[in-house]
Amino acid sequence: FENNTLVHKQTVVSTDILPPGERNKGSAAIKISPDGRHLYASNRGSTNNIAIFKIAADGLLSKVGEQATDAHPRDFLIDKSGRWLLVASRDGNSVKVYRVNTHTGLLADAGQSVSLPKPVMLLAY
C-alpha cells in the first residue's frame, strides 16, 4: 500500500510441490507475525503444511521453510507474543500448537493438541 494505492510487489509460491489436479487447493489462511518479520500461509490438499516467509524491509518475501501439519490446515492463529502458532486442521479434526522461533520464523511441534470435529476458524479473546 503506497500513497493510498494498493501496489503489486511480488508473486510467491507457498508450496514447492503441488500434485496434478490440486490447482484449486492452495493456501487458506495468510497471516503476518505480530513483529511484522514473517508471513505464514496454510497449504491444504496433499501438501498439508504452513509455509513460512521472511519479510524484508522493502516488503518483499523470501521463503524460509514449511512445517507439516495435520490434514487440511484451514486456519491458524499466532498469539500476541508471536511465540505460539495454533493450527485448525479441518480434515485432521485437530487444533495443534507449534512453537515459533521469533528470529527465523520456523515452527516446531510443541506436542500439544486437542481433538475437535472439523475446526475451520480460530479466534483469540
Language-model features and meaning:
Residues 1-8, 52-60, 99-106:
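Short loop/turn segments immediately following beta-strands, especially the blade-tip
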Residues 28-29, 74, 120:
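Structural signature of WD-repeat beta-propeller blades
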Residues 44-45, 90-91, 100:
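Short loop/turn segments immediately following the C-termini of beta-strands
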Residues 13-21, 62-67, 109-114:
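A short beta-strand motif characteristic of beta-propeller blades
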Residues 35-37, 81-83:
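Short coil/turn segments that connect the beta-strands within blades of beta-propeller domains
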